[in-house]
Amino acid sequence: MVLSAADKTNVKGVFSKISGHAEEYGAETLERMFTAYPQTKTYFPHFDLQHGSAQIKAHGKKVVAALVEAVNHIDDIAGALSKLSDLHAQKLRVDPVNFKFLGHCFLVVVAIHHPSALTAEVHASLDKFLCAVGTVLTAKYR
C-alpha cells in the first residue's frame, strides 16, 4: 500500500503527539490486544500480563519505538524494520493476523488520547501506515 504525501504528513503529525508517550500508549495497546484477542497472550507465556506490569510497559515501549522508527523512515519502512521482520518471521513465528490486531488496538488508543487529532482523513492515513508496517513485518513469512 502506497502512502501519499498527505498520508505521510498525517502520520508524522499524529506521531509527533505520540512519541513522548511510548511506554504508556504501548502498554495500553498491548493490554487492549490481550483483552480483546486473548489468543495473542500465547506469545508471551513468560510475561506478567497484569495491568501495569513492568514487562508489558517495557514491551509496549519497544512496539511504539518500532513504529516511530518506521515513521522516521516512512519512505523505507521495509529497510527500517528488516531486522524486526526477520525476528518475528523466523524466530518468534508470530501469526501474521496479530499485527492487524495490534494495529487496530493502537488506533483505539490513539483515538482515546487524541480524539480531535484523529479526523477521518488522519484515521485513514494512520490505518494505511499500520497496514504497511504489518505487510513489512509479514513479508519474510513467505
From Swiss-Prot:
It comes from the Eukaryota. The keyword Iron applies. Heme b binds at residue 88. The keyword Iron applies. Disulfide bonds: none annotated. GO terms for cellular component: blood microparticle; haptoglobin-hemoglobin complex; hemoglobin complex. InterPro entries: Globin, Globin-like_sf, Globin/Proto, Hemoglobin_a-typ, Hemoglobin_oxygen_transport, Hemoglobin_pi. Heterotetramer of two alpha chains and two beta chains. Belongs to the globin family. This is Hemoglobin subunit alpha-A. It comes from Anser indicus (Bar-headed goose).
